[in-house]
Swiss-Prot record:
NCBIfam families named among the record's database cross-references: recN
Key words of the record: ATP-binding, DNA damage, DNA repair, Nucleotide-binding
UniProt name for this protein: DNA repair protein RecN
Functional description taken from the UniProt entry: May be involved in recombinational repair of damaged DNA.
Organism listed in the record: Rickettsia conorii (strain ATCC VR-613 / Malish 7)
Recorded GO MF terms: ATP binding
Source domain of life: Bacteria
Similarity section: Belongs to the RecN family.
GO biological process: DNA recombination; DNA repair; SOS response
UniProt binding sites for ATP: G29, E30, T31, G32, A33, G34, K35, S36
GO CC terms of this entry: bacterial nucleoid
């Protein structure tokens, strides 16, 4: 509900602040006093189109602040739009002389569109030139379903519709992408089979690179051993030693040559031992020569696979896992396509059964609502008005396949047409009041504003309007701009607007009236500028004093 409204430099207003109450709040004032300025200020703040010249003459800016109470629906809206809820809701609009408007929710800058979305959660407006939201097609459907307690049926239908559409969408995607899905399955099947067979481990590339470097160093040692063996296996070495030994043997046991003979024998033995050791080393290198070749082949293969799939070698394992997962998903999509088709048929059948059931209920409820509204309209001096609810079939939606149109005629002999096209502002407001009275505690917004709902009525009819407004105010805050004392007399809060003509400017002031001031204002509304004893007495009676 509206908690307070503050306005500065707005049209004819210098500065004012109003605090609102629960229940019925009426706004009165002489014709031309500027009652519509308050409504303009509210619409300006909440992002709706208003007069272009809203900044008071001589000022650089205009600003309107409104404080609202909160409910869970509004809190959820704020959270969904990343605005931190506070104890109260603070909205603001600032317009500077250059024409730019800035909107704020809880001191956070927001767009005009978001402010307008928020407004739909805060209040309804019904008046001469404004009927916000209630005459939209979806709202008329909500009125009918709320009146007939059909919202649970509609929710079940909506759930079925969403499931049906999701299944259709999934089927369409599979059909559209059938070829590409099959191609991707082929690709992933080959890739996963290849990678599984290779079984490349994390860190394997680095280990193989280090091993290759080590083996390449050993390869150099192998070549050295081969070169040495080639040298010491030279036959001339053995021949030379044998010749030397034979020459010494001819000398007999000559002590002078014994040491030389021993050295030659040792040289021969050492040479044989070196040959054996070199042969053993050579034999041990045969395996490692093979291992180097195998290592290089494995390393080359890993690098080639990494380039092929454009994935780092260490990430090939993760790539394999993801590919297997995606392959499973795609195979399931193909396998489930027939199942989805059967499911789609069942959901479609269920939807039309539920929609048909809901349509039948709506037709019954529509007749009851028409009758209820006719009775209300009689009380509001619109006995000859016609109200009809036309229901036609349309394409399936989450809310059913019914096209619901509220139609009316306010003139005898005139065919009923869409309600917002045939009714005047005052008549339309009374239609809305009749609807609200019929619905009463259903579809209640935190606040409802009626702008001059009582145009063209008086006396008993005005009293009936006041009674219904009072009843409605027991479940929501009702703000009424009125000329009728019968309506104003039922207020919980009475606000008076006055326009004062000064020497150089015109000012508008706003005041919440006490009981004595209310009696005087009601008397003025009854008799005009000249307040009489009779009008004061009548005002006293309206206030039940």
């Amino acid at each position: 509900m509206f908690y307070s409204l503050s306005v500065k430099n707005f049209i004819l207003i210098d500065e004012l602040e109003i605090e609102f109450n629960k229940g019925l709040c009426v706004i009165t004032g002489e014709t031309g006093a500027g009652k519509s300025i308050l409504l303009d200020a509210i619409l300006f703040c909440l992002g709706y189109k208003t007069s272009n010249n809203i900044i008071k003459r001589g000022k650089d800016y205009a600003v309107v602040n409104i404080i609202f109470s909160l409910n869970e629906e509004i809190k959820n809206f704020l959270v969904q739009n990343f605005i931190e809820p506070e104890e109260l809701l603070f909205v603001k609009c600032l317009q500077k002389a250059e024409g730019r408007k800035n909107f704020f929710i809880n001191n956070q800058v927001v767009t005009k569109a978001l402010m307008q979305q928020l407004a739909t959660y805060l209040f309804e407006l019904h008046g001469q030139n404004n009927n916000i939201s209630l005459l939209e097609a979806n709202t008329q459907r909500d009125i009918l379903d709320s009146y007939g307690n059909l919202l649970d049926f509609r929710a079940e239908l909506s759930k079925c519709y969403q499931a049906w559409q999701n299944t259709r969408k999934e089927m369409a995607e599979i059909t559209l992408k059938q070829n590409s899905i099959e191609q991707e399955i082929d690709y992933l099947s080959f890739a996963t089979e290849e990678l599984t067979k290779l079984n490349i481990q994390t860190g394997e590339e680095e280990k193989l690179a280090n091993l290759r470097k080590d083996l390449q160093n050993k390869d150099k040692d192998l070549q050295l051993i081969k070169d040495i063996i080639e040298q010491i296996n030279n036959p001339e070495i053995n021949t030379s030693i044998n010749r030397a030994e034979k020459l010494l043997a001819r000398q007999g046991n000559n002590e002078r040559f014994e040491a030389i003979v021993t050295s030659l024998e040792e040289a021969y033995n050492n040479l044989e031992e070196a040959r054996q050791e070199l042969s053993n080393l050579l034999d041990s290198f045969n395996y490692e020569e093979y291992n180097l070749e195998e290592t290089e082949e494995r390393l080359f293969l890993i690098k080639a696979i990494s380039r092929k799939y454009n994935v780092p070698a260490d990430a090939l394992g993760v790539f394999l896992d993801k590919s297997l997962e995606q392959l499973s998903i795609l195979k399931n999509k193909i396998a489930n396509s027939n199942e989805l088709k059967a499911q789609e048929v069942l959901l479609q059948k269920k939807y039309y059964e539920l929609a048909s059931n809901l349509s039948a209920k709506r037709l019954i409820v529509a007749k009851h609502l028409e009758e209820s509204l006719h009775q209300e309209l009689k009380q509001l001096k619109m006995a000859k008005a016609i109200f009809e609810i036309e229901i036609n079939t349309k394409e399936p939606t989450a809310d059913g396949n019914d096209d619901i149109v509220f139609k009316a005629s306010t003139n005898p002999g005139t065919a009923a047409a869409a309600i917002n096209k045939i009714a005047s502002g005052g008549e339309l407001s009374r239609f809305m009041l009749a609807l609200k009275t019929a619905l009463f505690d259903k579809m209640v917004k935190p606040s409802i504003i009626f702008d001059e709902i009582d145009v063209g009525i008086s006396g008993e009819v005005a009293d009936k309007v006041g009674e219904r407004l009072k009843k409605l105010s027991s479940v929501t805050q009702v703000i009424v701009i009125t000329h009728q004392p019968q309506v104003a007399g039922k207020a919980d809060l009475h606000i008076k607007i006055e326009k004062t003509q000064l020497e150089k400017e015109t000012k508008v002031t706003v005041k919440a009236l006490n009981l004595a001031e209310r009696q005087e204002e009601l008397a003025r509304m009854i008799s005009g500028k000249t307040i009489t004893k009779a009008s004061l007495k009548a005002a006293k009676e309206l206030l039940h004093l």
